[in-house]
């Protein structure tokens, strides 16, 4: 997911999940060391958990609805990059065509988004071999 050594702590009696940087709220997630496809799969699993409170690595407390929004946003981005790759576009060309409106309000958009698109593109490219 976010990194090769991700760890989350689940407190079942309290229904609290300490998620670390696997989950972030109001900030662009950092794809630099990520397996983005696995991260999206992990988000699908987390949103199915019966958590009352989720403590993200960055931002305010989350709930499963927040996780669902992050999951949809990341899955939509990955699918858009994948479609662009399959159409023969470069990551720079894809970046110009993607609808990033849901990402723009998030903290660190300018610093992170270009690198995230490039990282996901390279992952998709590697999987195609």
Where are these regions (language model features)?
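Metallo-beta-lactamase
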Residues: 4-80
């Amino acid at each position: 997911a976010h990194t090769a050594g991700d760890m989350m702590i689940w407190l079942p009696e309290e229904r609290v999940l300490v998620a670390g940087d696997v989950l972030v709220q109001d900030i662009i997630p950092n794809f630099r060391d990520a397996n983005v496809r696995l991260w999206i799969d992990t988000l699908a699993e987390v949103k199915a958990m019966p958590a009352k409170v989720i403590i993200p690595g960055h931002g305010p407390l989350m709930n499963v609805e927040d996780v669902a929004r992050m999951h949809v946003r990341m899955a939509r981005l990955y699918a858009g990059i994948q479609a662009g790759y399959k159409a023969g576009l470069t990551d720079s060309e894809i970046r110009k065509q993607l609808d990033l409106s849901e990402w723009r309000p998030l903290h660190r958009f300018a610093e992170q988004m270009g690198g995230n698109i490039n990282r996901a593109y390279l992952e998709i490219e590697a999987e195609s071999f």
